[in-house]
Amino acid sequence: MKRCYITTPIYYASGKPHIGHAFTTILADVIKRFKIQNGYEAFLLVGSDEHGNKIESKAKSLNLDPKTFVDINAQAFKLMWKTLNISFDHFIRTTDEIHKQQVQKTFQDLYDKKLIYQSEWKGAYCVECEQNYFTFNKQTMLCEIGHNLSLVQEPCWFISFSSTKNWIETTIGKNQLNIIPKSRASELKNNFINNGLNDLALTRKNVTWGIKVPFDPNQTIYVWFDALFSYITNLGFRNGDPNFIKWWNNDNKEREVIHLISREITRFHCIYWPIFLHLLDIKLPTQFLSHGWIVDGEGRKMSKSLNNVISPEQLIDQFGVDGTRYCLLKEMRLDKDNRCSVSILKEIYNADLANSFGNHVSRTFGMIKKYLNGKLEYQIITDNALQKIMILIDESIVQFDHYFNSYEFYRAINLLLKIVFELSKLIDDFKPWELFKNQEFSLLKQLLFTCVRCVQVCYVLLTPILVNTASKVFHLFNFADDACRKDQLRDATLLKKIIISNSMEVLFKRVD
């Protein structure tokens, strides 16, 4: 069986989940559900990164010990993912004992291989990003995102990259990491690799909240090293767990390991992480999906200091869970930073969900109930105009998958919106009320069957996004189980007999 292992970043547990976390995690969940629809066995890993200076200082400011602080925030992430209908298979925490033991074993292994040496780190450090900087603006003392930098000089353990510089340059240059969008690979080469890849400091001396170096308890393992390995400590890679072979370290040509990340952490995932795996003789992920930032209406990165942060709760309150999932996925592009505001998402919600997908279901349901007493059997379409729509529907099934596999979600969705729009015009042209009045039942049934076929295809294809709504729609029309399956979607004859429910509620109420 084809298998796909999907990860979100292990989010830093210094606060509650925000819209950026929600978008990445919804994206991961939709990809997982899409893979399962297409015959894969899939696994989704989420979690929280719980060590480091930032955590320790924030906990102290609240008069909490670090573990209590991260317990509270990890629980907030878990609850949010359950609210957003995220079908995660495991929530890993870097404070889990099984994770800590494997990280220490890995650090010891690198030391035993003489890949780690002791020296002195001198440069700038960003507490917010948990990131070292060799080069930085000494006048502003701000990191690339805009957080304050502090000067640091301390002894620590480094990992040598001298033997891997050519390897990582070739690996990225030949697109062997399959970084999407491709522009991210160019950014990595131009901004980091071409400037010389410095050895990386793997420990901090003055950080107490973290995993200790096994052979030097005065040093704490760098939070990024700790966090990256959570992707495979979850699978017990150091403990002989068969899940590591099943999901990651195997020779299956159809093996897929997909990391979802935001662009500011691409360097850690697409340079350092592959190097770590290479040095340990572990197979690389098959794809890195690096999306842009979510910015406000003025193009500014969302931050608490600017008071422009949108919480997932705000969106859920306005648009519901499925509406939030849909609007974020439809609006966000992976290859650029995306402007986002409640007003922008409201336009999408009203236009796409309330007026198009939702209204088409209501209209179809109402016509079958009014004109056919709630019953409709399979129809052979002979009318030319309706035949064209049916062809368009069949073609959309293939095209939808093409766009979805390319992560062009807005294009995939627009295919279906076009069908709904064309069919809406045909309904107005055919005037079903007159067909009923004139007892032209053959044409009326063909029209309504085409409408039902459109409902079926749209909601089966959109099931990974509109999870709850799709289930409601299938129940409204009493679709047979086979008619709700993606692998049977080309077969319209599965709509043998439609018997609609007695009543329906509006699927997507307009938001004013």
From Swiss-Prot:
Xref: Gene3D superfamilies: 2.170.220.10, HUPs, Isoleucyl-tRNA Synthetase, Domain 1
Reactions listed under catalytic activity: tRNA(Met) + L-methionine + ATP = L-methionyl-tRNA(Met) + AMP + diphosphate
EC number of this enzyme: 6.1.1.10
Motif 'KMSKS' region boundaries: 301-305
Alphabetic keyword roster: Aminoacyl-tRNA synthetase, ATP-binding, Cytoplasm, Ligase, Metal-binding, Nucleotide-binding, Protein biosynthesis, Zinc
Function text: Is required not only for elongation of protein synthesis but also for the initiation of all mRNA translation through initiator tRNA(fMet) aminoacylation.
Subcellular localization: Cytoplasm
Subunit text: Monomer.
Residues involved in ATP binding: K304
Required cofactor(s): Zn(2+)
SUPFAM superfamilies: Anticodon-binding domain of a subclass of class I aminoacyl-tRNA synthetases, Nucleotidylyl transferase
GO cellular component term of the entry, any: cytoplasm
Positions bound to Zn(2+): C126, C129, C143, H147
Source organism of the structure: Mycoplasma genitalium (strain ATCC 33530 / DSM 19775 / NCTC 10195 / G37) (Mycoplasmoides genitalium)
Protein name: Methionine--tRNA ligase
Top-rank taxon: Bacteria
CDD domains: MetRS_core (cd00814)
UniProt keyword annotation of Ligase present: yes
Cofactor stoichiometry and binding remark: Binds 1 zinc ion per subunit.
Gene name of the record: metG
